[in-house]
């Protein structure tokens, strides 16, 4: 959840692999 909103968190290691960050 937190990884996708806001998308800025996609820079995080654990968030990067998520589809919402691709």
UniProtKB/Swiss-Prot annotation:
The modification 4-hydroxyproline is found at residues 6-7, 17. Transmembrane segments: none annotated. Expressed by the venom duct. The keyword Secreted applies. Its main location: secreted. One of its GO terms (molecular function) is sodium channel inhibitor activity. It comes from the Eukaryota. The modification Alanine amide is found at residue 22. The record marks 18 as: Increases tethering of the N-terminus (compared to GIIIA), forming a more compact structure. Keywords: Amidation, Disulfide bond, Hydroxylation, Ion channel impairing toxin, Neurotoxin, Secreted, Toxin, Voltage-gated sodium channel impairing toxin. It is found in: Secreted. Disulfide bonds join 3-15, 4-20, 10-21. The cysteine framework is III (CC-C-C-CC). Mu-conotoxins block voltage-gated sodium channels (Nav). This toxin shows potent activity on Nav1.4/SCN4A (IC(50)=286 nM), and weak activity on mNav1.6/SCN8A. Negative results: does not show activity when tested (1 uM) on rNav1.2/SCN2A, hNav1.5/SCN7A, hNav1.7/SCN9A and hNav1.8/ SCN10A. Both the Thr-5-hydroxypro-6 and Lys-16-hydroxypro-17 peptide bonds are in trans conformations, whereas the hydroxypro-6-hydroxypro-7 bond adopts a cis conformation. This is Mu-conotoxin GIIIC. It comes from Conus geographus.
